[in-house]
Amino acid sequence: MEHQVRCAVLGLGRLGYYHAKNLVTSVPGAKLVCVGDPLKGRAEQVARELGIEKWSEDPYEVLEDPGIDAVIIVTPTSTHGDMIIKAAENGKQIFVEKPLTLSLEESKAASEKVKETGVICQVGFMRRFDPAYADAKRRIDAGEIGKPIYYKGFTRDQGAPPAEFIKHSGGIFIDCSIHDYDIARYLLGAEITSVSGHGRILNNPFMEQYGDVDQALTYIEFDSGAAGDVEASRTSPYGHDIRAEVIGTEGSIFIGTLRHQHVTILSAKGSSFDIIPDFQTRFHEAYCLELQHFAECVRNGKTPIVTDIDATINLEVGIAATNSFRNGMPVQLDVKRAYTGM
């Protein structure tokens, strides 16, 4: 493909709008030509703001537009499966936010359609593109810490999402911890074989009606013999706190920092520094790089480093952790999955 990839962003909530802005400002291999959102007036508003000629209040209509090469799907997760299938049937290259869907059956059906039509499907596990995680991956693969034997990660959000989001999110293991499941698999180069999910409501009692929790822990085991634990929290009023450690037989790698800037204030009150305020600030570069990677894959016919197959595996782990939490028992996973060809 010689020209810029002609993209449409479908779904213009917080993250969809963010992707749209990044496509306009930070992805030279792509051109945003259309935006779509069913909320009356939203698509037109964003189109005018970003200088986009096409907009639609029917995202499905956009999937049939022959002037669009690729779609960035940031609609509610419950719509992902159907939109992926229709996009693939119309020959659109696909970038879709995580999770791929909320059920394994839907994810497998979407992946089958992607395979059948031969389109690209990249999923928004942006931590793989973050420079710190990418550097850690390079160093682990180079053997700098020996054999990786333990992953420890935590994701702490400033507060709980709105009730309407919680209701349709799939729960903390699928919505939040799934990022750690993905990056743990990626960094260790191993598949998760067992999960034990635990959780409690510590600060947000409204979550009980949705069967969700605001503090969760997943103990994980890998087919390489490694193990790990993943913490997820909806109570981090001091800022957006995402860090990880990989322990190896010859050393450890620490990933992430709380610091927003490399500035420390010393005074009679003590020492202080600004903390990263939100996920867009922490992962801005990663969000741009993942879209640049997607555009490069579309232009050159390459397979993305994170695909619908990865997303289906991550979802399977998230569902298993959720079931383990609810049933109080560990859940075993079969790494020889038919849908992966492993």
Curated annotation (Swiss-Prot):
Documented EC number(s): 1.1.1.370
What lineage does the source organism belong to? Bacteria, Bacillati, Bacillota, Bacilli, Bacillales
Gene name linked to the record: iolX
Q: Which reaction does it catalyse?
A: scyllo-inositol + NAD(+) = scyllo-inosose + NADH + H(+)
Q: Any one Gene Ontology biological process term?
A: cellular response to inositol
* Annotated family: Belongs to the Gfo/Idh/MocA family.
Keywords recorded for this protein, A-Z: NAD, Oxidoreductase
Q: What induces it?
A: Induced by either myo-inositol (MI) or SI; SI is approximately three times more efficient than MI.
Gene null: resulting phenotype: Inactivation of this gene abolishes growth on SI as the sole carbon source, but does not affect growth on MI or glucose.
Q: Which organism is it from?
A: Bacillus subtilis (strain 168)
What is the official name of this protein in its record?
scyllo-inositol 2-dehydrogenase (NAD(+))
Give the metabolic or biological pathway. Answer: Polyol metabolism
Q: What class of enzyme is it?
A: oxidoreductase
